[in-house]
Every structure is written in C-alpha cells, then in structure tokens.
Amino acid sequence: VHALVLPPGPALSEAVRHALTGEGPAVLPLSPDLPRPALAATLAALRPTHVVTQDGVRREPDGEPSDAALIIATSGSTGAPKGVELTAEALLASARASLARLGAREGDRWLCCLPPSHISGAQVLVRSLLCGTEPIVHSRFSPEEVAASGADHVSLVPTQLRRMLDAGAGVAAFRTILLGGAAAPPGLLAEARAAGARIVTTYGSSETSGGCVYDGVPLDGVEVKIGGDGRVRIAGPVLFSGYRLRDERPFEGGWFVTSDLGSIEDGRLTVLGRADDVINTGGRKVVAGVVAEVLAAHPAVRDVVVVGRPDPEWGEITVAVVVPRDTREVTLDELRDFAKERLPAYAAPRAVELVSQIPLLPNGKPDMVALKNRN
C-alpha cells in the first residue's frame, strides 16, 4: 500500500491507473495540505507500507499490505480515521455504470476539482481513464477557471455550485454537473437549472465507490431498500470489501447498512438525513435533515444546517445555523412559524445562529463537529 501524499496531477493519476490494472500497489491518496498531526494519525491508523511525497518514497516499518486497489481515508464528520478498501472491480463497476447513465462517450473530458483523497475526486480519475482521456485537474477551486476548463463533465459539491452561480460563471458549459457530497437546497438546483445547467444529483459514500444513486434512481446493478430501522441499505458490485485493519462489518446478508435514513416511493430514493443526526428533544425525535430541507426553502435563507445541542430542560434542542440571503437578517420567530406550517411544532428550531458561511470539511460536507460545538 502506497500512501500518496501528493497534489492532484499526472503522478497521482498514473498511480491510480496502475492500481486498477494490478500493475502497481494499492494506493491511499492523502492531501498534502493535511496538518502534520492529522497526517501522522492517519498513517498510524492505516499503516501503509510506503509513503510517497514529492521528496521521494519512504518505507514504513510496520506497514500492512492490502488486496484492494484504492483505500480512502474517511472519518466522516465525527470520528477517527477509517480506511475504506475498494477493489478494482468495485471502482470500475461504479465508473462504468455512471458513464452509461450519463451517456458519456469515449474521448469525453472530466474536470477534477475535488480532492482525489476523497472518493468523489478519485472517481473522476477512474471515469477519465475509462473515457481514454487525461483528467483536467484544478488543485484550487476558481469558478471562472472551472467554467473555462473545456471539460464535458464535472463533479461538484453544493458549495462550489453556489460559488459558480454567485460569480456568474457559465454552468451551462458542461454536458453534466454531478452534484453530491451534501444535500443541495432545492432553490440552488432550481437556480442552476434555470441558468442552463444539466444537474444530476448523486447519493453514495466511500463505501459504495461514490455516487450509486443518481437523481434518486440506483445505477444499473445497484439495489436499494429501507430496513425496519429506517436506514438505507445498498447492494451491488460497487460495495467496498471492508475497513482496513478493522473487524467492523456493516453488512446484513450482502447489504451495506448505511447511517442514512430514507424512503422509497415509485422506485425513487429520498434521503431524509443521517440516523446519528436524529435530535431527541423533550422525548420527540426530529430528523435534522428534514428540518434543514424545509428551512432552506425560506426566502431569506441562503444555506442552513440543523443540529442538536444539549439543553438542561429538553435534553437536546434543535438549532438552525443559517447563512442569510443577501444582507437581510432572519429571526427565530420567522423560522419557527415557517417550519410549523410544514412540520409538527416540536420539530421547529428553538434557536437560530446567523453565520457568514457554513464551516466545511475538505470534502465539501458541513463540519458537524464544529457546528454542534459552537458556543
């Protein structure tokens, strides 16, 4: 296993290519921007045999080999580093199904402006390989440079799409914008589509080789169902083989049990939120993602994340962290009234915080630890 502490570019793409064909070792892409303590913790937890940097290759004395092609280090937004082990077969099955669904062709160009240390960025590299082209790589996100890239397809997170729209960058330049990593506010999707963008929303995780459900419909070969506990379960050739050096196996009879709550209607999956984002307030269960989706439709709200915080009276209270639209402030009473018109009264937020932007992890998802622990 080679831990690649390298910026996005040809060396990293070539290492992924060799891992997929079996000509090279398994690769563990890591961001060179990781703080030193975080890098040390990740290497200690995942134990690669070699560490590759721009200065050379270093052999690790306690490294462990792997049968995987790609290992993605993921802690979500809450935990210690885990290594999601993905075989070449799983990665290629995902990429082929994605290209088929999108109608992508040989020779199509993909733009990589997400970190290859995350599955969304890594899969852009895999799709490029299958299209027979070199990925266009942007190590730093610039709306204007993205719009002018000349790529046919791009994978973005909602924050990046929001910045492109705010900058007036040409979102219609792409045949496809895959949008994932976090729930997209309905208003953002409507605005982007009105600007001529072909948006395809994706749902998945590192454990499913990235997005495996497009616009609510599973990719070919992927099956989705809801268990008795309300959690989404996924089966198919795209699944990971396990967590590196851990016995943890979140499977039930071949189905991967996710941490997401969902519902299926007419064959279309709706993700309601994370099971660990259920807020227990006064004995009532509130799904934070459902409340956030409702509040996102308020005309004064540009972006919102809903979290639970400890409270001596209620156990937990529902807190809306809001980025206001333009300069208009939005009050707690406004948001509570808006929510109570659409949800049970107990689900309405009991506190609101106005912020200039939502704190994000490197993969574009909200930093839930920071949001839950804000003073």
Q: Language-model segments: which ranges?
A:
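AMP-binding/adenylate-forming catalytic core of the ANL superfamily
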Residues: G236, L261-A347
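AMP-binding/adenylate-forming
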Residues: A44-V52, E85-M164, T176, V200
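Conserved pre-ATP/AMP-binding loop-to-beta segment of ANL
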Residues: P7-P8, R58-A73, A80, G103-R109
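Gly/Ser/Thr-rich phosphate-binding loop
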Residues: M164-P218, E223-K225
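Short beta-strand->loop structural element characteristic of the AMP-binding/adenylate-forming
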Residues: H2-L46, K82-E85, E134-R140
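Flexible, low-complexity linker/hinge segments
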Residues: V1, R36-A40, L46-A68, S94-A95
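AMP-binding/adenylate-forming catalytic domain of the ANL superfamily
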Residues: P344-K365
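Conserved ATP/PPi-binding loop(s) of AMP-dependent carboxylate-activating enzymes
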Residues: P218, G227-G254, R274, V286
